[in-house]
Amino acid sequence: MKKSLFIPLFIIFFSAFCFSQENKNVTLNIRVFLQGPYSNYSMSDELDKENLIPLSQPYNVNPWGYNGNEQVTKIPKDIVDWILVELTNDTNRSKIISQKAAFLRVDGKVTSLDGKNSLTFENLKEKSCYIVIQHRNHLPVMSSHSVDLDNEVHYDFTSSNQNAFDNSLVDLGNSEYGMISGDSDCNGEINKQDFRVVASNLLKVGYENADLDMNGVVNILDYKIINGNLSKRTAVR
Protein backbone atom coordinates (compact mmCIF):
# COMPACT_ATOMS: atom_id res chain seq x y z
CA MET A 1 0.00 0.00 0.00
CA LYS A 2 2.78 2.42 0.94
CA LYS A 3 4.67 1.55 -2.23
CA SER A 4 1.68 2.33 -4.49
CA LEU A 5 1.27 5.77 -2.88
CA PHE A 6 4.96 6.61 -3.17
CA ILE A 7 5.10 6.42 -6.98
CA PRO A 8 2.34 8.99 -7.81
CA LEU A 9 3.55 11.31 -5.01
CA PHE A 10 7.06 11.16 -6.44
CA ILE A 11 5.74 11.96 -9.93
CA ILE A 12 3.80 14.97 -8.63
CA PHE A 13 6.84 16.29 -6.75
CA PHE A 14 9.17 15.73 -9.70
CA SER A 15 6.78 17.44 -12.14
CA ALA A 16 6.42 20.45 -9.87
CA PHE A 17 10.21 20.68 -9.52
CA CYS A 18 10.73 20.57 -13.29
CA PHE A 19 8.07 23.22 -13.89
CA SER A 20 9.68 25.59 -11.41
CA GLN A 21 13.03 25.02 -13.07
CA GLU A 22 11.71 25.74 -16.57
CA ASN A 23 9.95 29.01 -15.79
CA LYS A 24 12.26 31.89 -15.02
CA ASN A 25 12.44 35.65 -14.86
CA VAL A 26 15.01 37.21 -17.18
CA THR A 27 16.38 40.75 -16.95
CA LEU A 28 17.37 42.34 -20.26
CA ASN A 29 20.13 44.94 -20.25
CA ILE A 30 19.61 46.45 -23.71
CA ARG A 31 21.04 49.55 -25.36
CA VAL A 32 19.67 50.98 -28.59
CA PHE A 33 19.71 54.38 -30.29
CA LEU A 34 17.08 56.02 -32.50
CA GLN A 35 18.49 57.93 -35.46
CA GLY A 36 15.88 60.69 -35.35
CA PRO A 37 16.67 62.23 -31.96
CA TYR A 38 20.35 61.16 -31.88
CA SER A 39 23.14 63.72 -31.56
CA ASN A 40 26.67 63.36 -30.16
CA TYR A 41 26.58 60.13 -28.15
CA SER A 42 23.02 60.52 -26.83
CA MET A 43 19.42 61.26 -27.82
CA SER A 44 17.23 64.29 -27.27
CA ASP A 45 14.40 64.12 -24.74
CA GLU A 46 12.57 67.05 -26.32
CA LEU A 47 9.25 65.19 -26.39
CA ASP A 48 9.50 64.69 -22.65
CA LYS A 49 10.48 68.31 -22.01
CA GLU A 50 7.43 69.44 -23.98
CA ASN A 51 5.18 67.01 -22.06
CA LEU A 52 4.20 65.28 -25.30
CA ILE A 53 4.92 61.64 -24.44
CA PRO A 54 1.66 59.83 -23.56
CA LEU A 55 1.28 58.29 -20.12
CA SER A 56 0.07 54.99 -21.65
CA GLN A 57 2.00 52.84 -24.12
CA PRO A 58 1.14 53.77 -27.75
CA TYR A 59 1.49 50.34 -29.40
CA ASN A 60 -2.12 49.20 -28.97
CA VAL A 61 -2.88 50.21 -32.59
CA ASN A 62 -1.97 48.72 -35.97
CA PRO A 63 0.46 47.42 -37.03
CA TRP A 64 1.55 46.30 -33.55
CA GLY A 65 -1.79 45.51 -31.88
CA TYR A 66 -0.11 45.13 -28.51
CA ASN A 67 -2.69 45.06 -25.71
CA GLY A 68 -0.38 45.58 -22.74
CA ASN A 69 -1.59 47.92 -20.00
CA GLU A 70 1.70 49.71 -19.30
CA GLN A 71 1.06 53.23 -18.06
CA VAL A 72 2.53 55.75 -15.63
CA THR A 73 1.30 58.80 -13.76
CA LYS A 74 4.39 60.77 -14.79
CA ILE A 75 7.07 60.27 -17.44
CA PRO A 76 10.43 59.66 -15.71
CA LYS A 77 13.37 62.00 -16.28
CA ASP A 78 15.57 61.69 -19.41
CA ILE A 79 13.10 59.56 -21.39
CA VAL A 80 13.16 59.73 -25.20
CA ASP A 81 10.01 57.72 -25.95
CA TRP A 82 8.14 54.45 -25.53
CA ILE A 83 9.46 51.41 -27.39
CA LEU A 84 8.12 47.87 -27.76
CA VAL A 85 10.44 44.97 -26.89
CA GLU A 86 9.64 41.54 -28.30
CA LEU A 87 11.19 38.15 -27.68
CA THR A 88 10.79 35.79 -30.62
CA ASN A 89 11.31 32.06 -31.12
CA ASP A 90 14.88 31.06 -31.96
CA THR A 91 13.80 28.72 -34.78
CA ASN A 92 10.75 30.67 -36.00
CA ARG A 93 11.63 34.35 -35.72
CA SER A 94 8.10 35.48 -36.64
CA LYS A 95 6.65 33.76 -33.56
CA ILE A 96 6.46 36.17 -30.63
CA ILE A 97 7.15 34.59 -27.23
CA SER A 98 6.57 37.69 -25.14
CA GLN A 99 6.20 41.47 -25.50
CA LYS A 100 6.57 44.47 -23.23
CA ALA A 101 6.35 48.22 -23.70
CA ALA A 102 9.30 50.00 -22.12
CA PHE A 103 10.98 53.37 -21.92
CA LEU A 104 14.07 54.39 -23.88
CA ARG A 105 16.44 56.69 -22.03
CA VAL A 106 18.69 59.37 -23.59
CA ASP A 107 21.78 57.18 -23.09
CA GLY A 108 20.18 54.32 -25.03
CA LYS A 109 19.27 52.17 -22.05
CA VAL A 110 15.95 50.33 -22.29
CA THR A 111 14.24 50.63 -18.92
CA SER A 112 11.20 49.50 -17.02
CA LEU A 113 8.49 52.02 -16.21
CA ASP A 114 10.54 53.65 -13.45
CA GLY A 115 13.02 54.94 -16.05
CA LYS A 116 15.94 53.42 -14.13
CA ASN A 117 15.89 49.65 -13.84
CA SER A 118 16.38 47.23 -16.72
CA LEU A 119 13.39 45.46 -18.24
CA THR A 120 12.43 42.07 -16.81
CA PHE A 121 10.36 39.36 -18.52
CA GLU A 122 8.61 36.92 -16.21
CA ASN A 123 7.84 33.19 -16.47
CA LEU A 124 9.84 32.40 -19.59
CA LYS A 125 10.17 28.73 -20.54
CA GLU A 126 12.41 29.12 -23.59
CA LYS A 127 16.16 28.60 -23.36
CA SER A 128 16.97 31.18 -26.06
CA CYS A 129 15.30 33.77 -28.29
CA TYR A 130 15.82 36.73 -30.61
CA ILE A 131 15.37 40.28 -29.32
CA VAL A 132 13.28 42.67 -31.44
CA ILE A 133 12.95 46.41 -30.86
CA GLN A 134 9.96 48.23 -32.34
CA HIS A 135 9.46 52.01 -32.50
CA ARG A 136 6.57 53.98 -33.97
CA ASN A 137 8.56 55.78 -36.72
CA HIS A 138 11.85 53.88 -36.97
CA LEU A 139 12.44 50.58 -38.78
CA PRO A 140 12.31 47.61 -36.37
CA VAL A 141 15.56 45.79 -35.60
CA MET A 142 16.34 42.30 -34.37
CA SER A 143 19.40 40.82 -32.69
CA SER A 144 21.82 39.24 -35.16
CA HIS A 145 21.62 35.92 -33.32
CA SER A 146 19.54 34.24 -30.67
CA VAL A 147 20.56 34.95 -27.09
CA ASP A 148 20.62 32.53 -24.18
CA LEU A 149 17.93 33.36 -21.65
CA ASP A 150 19.96 33.24 -18.50
CA ASN A 151 18.84 35.23 -15.47
CA GLU A 152 20.42 38.33 -17.01
CA VAL A 153 21.01 39.18 -20.68
CA HIS A 154 23.24 41.95 -22.07
CA TYR A 155 22.76 43.14 -25.65
CA ASP A 156 24.08 46.33 -27.25
CA PHE A 157 22.63 47.41 -30.61
CA THR A 158 24.66 50.65 -30.52
CA SER A 159 28.23 49.34 -30.77
CA SER A 160 28.21 47.57 -34.15
CA ASN A 161 26.04 47.19 -37.24
CA GLN A 162 26.76 43.47 -37.01
CA ASN A 163 24.73 43.31 -33.81
CA ALA A 164 21.52 43.69 -35.84
CA PHE A 165 20.07 40.99 -38.08
CA ASP A 166 21.03 41.68 -41.72
CA ASN A 167 23.22 44.63 -40.60
CA SER A 168 20.09 46.79 -40.53
CA LEU A 169 21.32 49.72 -38.43
CA VAL A 170 22.42 53.17 -39.58
CA ASP A 171 25.89 54.57 -38.90
CA LEU A 172 25.43 57.53 -36.53
CA GLY A 173 29.11 58.47 -36.40
CA ASN A 174 31.23 58.28 -33.25
CA SER A 175 31.43 54.49 -33.82
CA GLU A 176 27.77 54.20 -32.82
CA TYR A 177 24.77 52.77 -34.64
CA GLY A 178 21.02 53.19 -34.40
CA MET A 179 17.60 52.28 -35.70
CA ILE A 180 16.72 53.90 -39.04
CA SER A 181 14.25 56.79 -38.94
CA GLY A 182 11.69 57.65 -41.62
CA ASP A 183 8.93 55.04 -41.34
CA SER A 184 6.15 57.54 -40.67
CA ASP A 185 3.39 55.15 -41.81
CA CYS A 186 4.77 52.26 -39.74
CA ASN A 187 4.78 49.69 -42.55
CA GLY A 188 8.40 48.58 -42.26
CA GLU A 189 9.59 50.37 -45.40
CA ILE A 190 10.65 53.93 -46.17
CA ASN A 191 9.15 55.11 -49.44
CA LYS A 192 7.13 57.90 -51.09
CA GLN A 193 4.14 57.21 -48.87
CA ASP A 194 6.18 58.44 -45.90
CA PHE A 195 6.61 61.78 -47.68
CA ARG A 196 2.82 61.99 -47.99
CA VAL A 197 2.35 61.35 -44.26
CA VAL A 198 4.73 64.19 -43.43
CA ALA A 199 3.05 66.48 -45.97
CA SER A 200 -0.41 65.86 -44.51
CA ASN A 201 0.85 66.65 -41.00
CA LEU A 202 3.17 69.55 -41.84
CA LEU A 203 3.61 72.10 -39.02
CA LYS A 204 1.64 70.00 -36.56
CA VAL A 205 2.93 70.19 -33.00
CA GLY A 206 2.59 67.14 -30.78
CA TYR A 207 3.28 63.43 -30.50
CA GLU A 208 3.18 62.68 -34.23
CA ASN A 209 4.60 59.70 -36.12
CA ALA A 210 5.50 62.14 -38.89
CA ASP A 211 7.85 63.96 -36.48
CA LEU A 212 10.83 61.84 -37.47
CA ASP A 213 13.52 63.75 -35.58
CA MET A 214 11.22 63.77 -32.54
CA ASN A 215 11.55 67.47 -31.71
CA GLY A 216 7.82 67.99 -31.25
CA VAL A 217 6.96 69.55 -34.61
CA VAL A 218 6.56 68.18 -38.15
CA ASN A 219 8.65 70.24 -40.58
CA ILE A 220 11.05 70.16 -43.53
CA LEU A 221 13.73 68.42 -41.46
CA ASP A 222 11.51 65.33 -41.42
CA TYR A 223 11.47 65.30 -45.23
CA LYS A 224 15.27 65.23 -45.20
CA ILE A 225 15.33 62.16 -42.95
CA ILE A 226 13.06 60.24 -45.33
CA ASN A 227 15.10 61.32 -48.33
CA GLY A 228 18.30 60.06 -46.71
CA ASN A 229 16.80 56.64 -45.97
CA LEU A 230 14.60 56.14 -49.02
CA SER A 231 14.02 52.50 -50.07
CA LYS A 232 15.34 51.07 -46.81
CA ARG A 233 13.22 48.40 -45.16
CA THR A 234 13.21 46.32 -42.01
CA ALA A 235 14.79 42.88 -41.84
CA VAL A 236 12.36 41.83 -39.11
CA ARG A 237 9.83 39.15 -40.18
Region roles according to the model:
Residues 77, 111-128, 137:
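Short Pro-Gly-centered beta-turn/loop motif in secreted/extracellular proteins
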Residues 135-144:
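Short acidic/polar inter-strand loop motif in beta-rich domains
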Residues 1-28, 237:
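Bacterial Sec-dependent N-terminal signal peptides
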Residues 82-85, 126-136:
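A short, solvent-exposed beta-strand micro-motif common in secreted/extracellular proteins
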Residues 25-76:
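Short amphipathic, basic-aromatic surface patches that mediate peripheral association
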Residues 24-37, 73, 148-186:
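Extracellular beta-sheet/turn segments enriched in Thr/Pro/Gly and aliphatic residues
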Residues 97-109:
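Solvent-exposed serine/threonine-rich low-complexity stretches and specific carbohydrate-binding patches
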Residues 168-173, 184-209, 215-236:
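Alpha-helical segments with a strong preference for the paired helices of cellulosomal dockerin domains
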